UniProtKB/Swiss-Prot annotation:
Alphabetical list of PROSITE patterns matching this protein: PTS_EIIB_TYPE_2
Keyword Nucleotide-binding: no
Gene this protein is translated from: ulaB
GO cellular component: cytoplasm
Protein induction: Induced by L-ascorbate. Repressed by UlaR.
Protein name: Ascorbate-specific PTS system EIIB component
Modification Phosphocysteine occurs at: 9
Keyword list, A-Z: Cytoplasm, Kinase, Phosphoprotein, Phosphotransferase system, Transferase, Transport
Naturally occurring in which organism (per UniProt): Salmonella typhimurium (strain LT2 / SGSC1412 / ATCC 700720)
Reported function: The phosphoenolpyruvate-dependent sugar phosphotransferase system (sugar PTS), a major carbohydrate active transport system, catalyzes the phosphorylation of incoming sugar substrates concomitantly with their translocation across the cell membrane. The enzyme II UlaABC PTS system is involved in ascorbate transport.
The PTS EIIB type-2 domain, residue ranges: 3-96
GO molecular function annotation: kinase activity; protein-N(PI)-phosphohistidine-sugar phosphotransferase activity
Cysteines engaged in disulfide bonds, as pairs: none
Amino acid sequence: MTVRILAVCGNGQGSSMIMKMKVDQFLTQSNIDHTVNSCAVGEYKSELSGADIIIASTHIAGEISVTGNKYVVGVRNMLSPADFGPKLLEVIKEHFPQDVK
C-alpha cells in the first residue's frame, strides 16, 4: 500500500505546491512508499477519498476535519523538512508502517 499525502494551503496554488515538492523529496529520501497531491483548503473535502494524511500550516490544519483512518498534520514551517519531517514520519510509522521500506 502507498501512503497518500495531501498538502493543503489557502489557495492551492503557492505554498501547497511547494510543500508537495518538499514532502515528496523528504519521503523519497526517507524510503517511504507515497504519493503527494495538493489543493486549496476549500477543496480538501472533495480530495479526502484519495488521501490518508493531510498536511497544512497550523492555522489551516485547525479548519480541517477528518474521520476514520485519516490524519491531519499541522506544521509551523511548511517548507522546512526539519519542521514537518518528524511530525509526518511519526504519523506514518504509527499508522502506516507497511509503507516504510
